[in-house]
């Protein structure tokens, strides 16, 4: 099968639209709500999940025929835990402030429903390259929602993006006030719900 055959393209693109892990399958909601108060940690978390999902898929796909069925979940968890540890150490070394913001949520990637679901449903049944594409697609789909929600919450809640002030002081002089509710966890849930609503209204409008 060609590297970029029609089937492989669908494997990559499906998680970005109709079969989106958060919008379509409603997986990974907890971390999506927890790390989106600001855009920067949302981007880092999204990239971390993408990298870990992609490489965990590849590793499990390579060794899938040697894994005893009774311990396959344990093996998957060990592989993911090893990758999460590596990513966590890299973040602490090169982006310490972000790693502090993300706190325990990087470690909780180990139990992320999206990741474990792709390992069990796809990587265990497919070759390494399609598994890699599936991991990247699902990771990017997850990251996309984190970026949308994180950007909206930071912009309307703080008037900034990536820590840089976006709204000019003139707005505040005219009486504009940042929406403090956007910094509350409940708003993340509401925003994710709105995005899910728009997604389903678009893709399921014929039904």
Residue ranges and their predicted role:
Residues 86-101:
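Transmembrane alpha-helix boundary signature
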């Amino acid at each position: 099968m060609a590297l970029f055959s029609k089937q492989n393209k669908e494997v990559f693109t499906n998680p970005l639209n109709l079969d989106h892990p958060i919008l379509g399958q409603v997986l990974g909601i907890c971390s999506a709500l927890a790390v989106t108060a600001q855009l920067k940690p949302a981007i880092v978390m999204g990239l971390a999940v993408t990298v870990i999902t992609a490489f965990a898929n590849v590793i499990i796909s390579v060794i899938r025929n040697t894994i005893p069925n009774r311990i396959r979940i344990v093996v998957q968890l060990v592989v993911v835990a090893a990758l999460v540890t590596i990513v966590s150490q890299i973040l602490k070394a090169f982006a310490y402030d972000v790693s502090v913001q993300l706190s325990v949520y990087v470690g909780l990637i180990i139990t992320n429903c999206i990741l474990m679901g792709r390992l069990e449903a796809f990587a265990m049944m497919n070759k390494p390259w399609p598994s890699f594409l599936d991991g990247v697609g699902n990771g990017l789909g997850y990251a996309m929602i984190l970026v949308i929600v994180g950007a909206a919450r930071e912009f309307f809640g703080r008037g900034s993006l990536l820590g840089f002030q976006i709204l000019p002081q003139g707005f505040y002089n005219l009486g504009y006030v940042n929406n403090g509710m956007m910094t509350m966890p409940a708003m993340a849930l509401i925003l994710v719900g709105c995005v899910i609503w728009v997604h389903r209204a678009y893709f399921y409008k014929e039904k």
